[in-house]
Every structure is written in structure tokens, then in C-alpha cells.
Amino acid sequence: MPELPEVETIARGLNRRVAGDVIESVWLGSKPEPLKSPATKIVNALESRRIAGVRRVGKHIVFDLENGGRPALTARKGQAGKSARPTRSGAQWIVHLGMTGRMLVCPPDAEIERHTHAVAKLASGRELRFVDPRRFGRLSVSSGFEAAGSEPLEVDLASFVVLFRGRKTPIKSALLNQKLLSGVGNIYADESLFRASVRPRRRVASLTRDELGRLYQAIREVLKEAIALGGSSISDYVDSDGEEGSFQLQHRVYGREGQPCLVCKTPVKRVVIAGRSAHYCPKCQK
């Protein structure tokens, strides 16, 4: 599943390419799974809207929309709803990529891939296409979408300590709790815990303030490095231009079960914590 760095990379690419463009028409596929909001509501909220900007909120891509677009084009065959000009402002198109979702900017003559669930035709002639083979991704509209938890790159150390201090769950599980930190997943939790020298099974309450401080810094460092390298391309992840990231080449423990630790040469271990895999070095992490 794309995590914070991958979603940030995609959102930045989309903002660079489509901010200021106008959504003229929207086509939605027949599969109901990707639609978290009713199809007609999505179409009516998007058509004739100008894309004010694209940003990341947690693991979601948020298209901020505003009025003032040109009249919508005639609906395509299969379109789920009629063209309409929304009267309210501040609408948002929310995209969660799920496990295999991709949000691509394509020329209109590009072949439409199998598993394409949404196409937004833009005034510039290009198309925004949502492709998701496994259909765990979600499309919705909102007017005030916010992340459930704190943003890892925005929260300060004192607030971070307050969020985690005293919890009885394993630290790996706490890092994956989107109501605490929004956007961190398996990859970056494992990599951050390694850099902080903390084992994933440790109960949060057992961590000292110094250890929480190291973890806070490690999370920020790992996420910033991953964003700079375009994220980790594992399985299907590509950015909005169809390009892969390269942070997977920098992974120190994630996905390296049985391989020697890059620091001490001890074989990396994999354990399951609350149904989720965790990778760690039994010597470097305490």
C-alpha cells in the first residue's frame, strides 16, 4: 500500500501538472467498490470545477476544487450522472490508492488500461485516470477533509511524546495507528524503528523519553529521504508520470528477512505483530 512518501510524491506531481486545469466531464466505471460517495454525487461535485491544487492528507490525495470552470462537455457513454455546475465552493475530491491504485495523467488517445475505474477529462485535453486492479482504493468527495491523526512531518516533539507516552501496545502497532500518526505504514515504521534502535515488539510504555526522541527524529529523516527519492517502488507503485521511486534501494530492514544487517551483519528477522509483518535487527535494536 502506498504510504506517506509515495502519496506525497504523487500529489506533488499531480499538482505540478493539473493545478489550474478544469474538469469538464467525468466517467465512472461500473464496479461499485471504489466509490465511497454515490456516483452521481462524485460526478456533480467534480464537473465544471477548476483544480485549485492537489495535496496529500495522510495517505489520501486531495484535489481542492473551486467554481469558475467552463461548462461541462456531453457525458460519455457509461457516465454515472448528469453534468451539473455545483453552486457551493470548497469541494474536495478525495482519492485513497488502496493497495494497487494509481492516479495517472494521460493524453486522450492513450489506451485505457484494464481496471480503470474513473476518468476525468480536463479542459487542457488531458485525462486524469484512476486505475486499481485490486479495487481497494476509494474515491469520494468532501468539503472539509482532514487526517484522523497528526502529520508526522508537522507534529513537534513534545506533541509526539504526548501522543505515544504510556500506551500499552507494541510500538510497531502504535506507529501504524492512523489515529495517532497519519501516513506511516509497514515500510517506514520498520525503517524508522531500525534507525532509532528500537525493537518493534517493545511496549510503547517501556520507551524512555530519549528513545521516543530518537524515534521522532528517525521518522522525520526516513520520510524526508523517501520523498526525495520518489518513494519505494514495491509491487505496483509508480508516480503520476508512471515513474518508479528508488527508496527501496535504501531499505535497511524492510523486506530483508534472513539477509545480513547492513550495520552488524546479523541476519534480519521478521515477526508478525497484530497481524502485520515487522522486520528488525536483533542486535542493533533493543
Regions flagged by a language model, labelled:
Residues M1-K77, G81-R135, E154, R209, ...:
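Gly/Gly-Pro- and Ser/Thr-rich, intrinsically disordered tail segments characteristic of DNA damage-repair
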Residues P2-P5, G149, P200:
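Proline-rich low-complexity regions
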Residues I23-A45, R55, H60, N67-G68, ...:
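Basic, nucleic-acid-binding surfaces and adjacent catalytic neighborhoods in DNA/RNA-processing proteins
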Residues S89-R195, R203:
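Phosphate/anion-contacting hairpin/loop surfaces
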